[in-house]
Amino acid sequence: MRRSLAAIAGVVLVLFAVGGASAQRQGNASSSSARDLAPIDLTGYWVSYVTENWRYRMVTPAKGEYRRIPASPAALPIINAWDPVADQRAGNQCKSYGAAAIMSVPGRLRITWQDADTLRIDTDAGTQTRLLRFTAGAPGNKSASAPRPTWQGESNARWERVAAPDTGGSLRVVTSNLRAGYLRKNGVPYSERTTVSEHFDLAPLPDGGTLLLVTTIVEDPVYLNVPYVVSPHFKKEPDGSKWDPTPCSSTW
């Protein structure tokens, strides 16, 4: 009987020890930064690898051209009235470089950690900066005291891990509080009510290089009939020797 009680007591002690160790691991995980918990490394220099919508991205489409964008009837007067010179004069030359469009603008990215819980994306096209903040709560939640809308808006991020071991994961980002801009350089609009959802994934290339795959979903109840989805790709570069920031322009 005493041996049985001793055995039971031993099992209980082992369970407490295991439970305590598990709780400690969970506590350590919850206190770790987003940088420490990253399942994939997105940092470095990346150049656009244009595999879709070449004719709409590499040159400015003609006025009135909005094929492949599910523009609503409300968008058509703006599309047909597009005047790049007027935009430039009004200081709106960055309208096609906002968060809903910037990843599709051909150019280079520089991705770094601004701090332990903020991933920073700089673009040489338009010299834009996106700050992806790993904040508590659901991505896309806008604070009650949100600042004025900006071209890059407010981006909340979180890591999404794959269930299988050693298979990495992806980054999910939701951006809101955007200043109204253009989905394409020729004046196809999106409104301040737009929300941009993105997934960032990595994929190997046959030559040993790495691709950054960005799936972008733009939702706008004002100027889009249905969500607009694009998938710009970027190839990793060895260094920043080709990094060449240029200002926004509405005329080229």
Identify the residue ranges that each predicted region occupies.
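Bacterial N-terminal signal peptides that target proteins for export
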Residues: 1-9
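PEST-like low-complexity, intrinsically disordered acidic/proline/serine-rich tracts
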Residues: 2, 20-252
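Bacterial N-terminal signal peptides
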Residues: 8-17
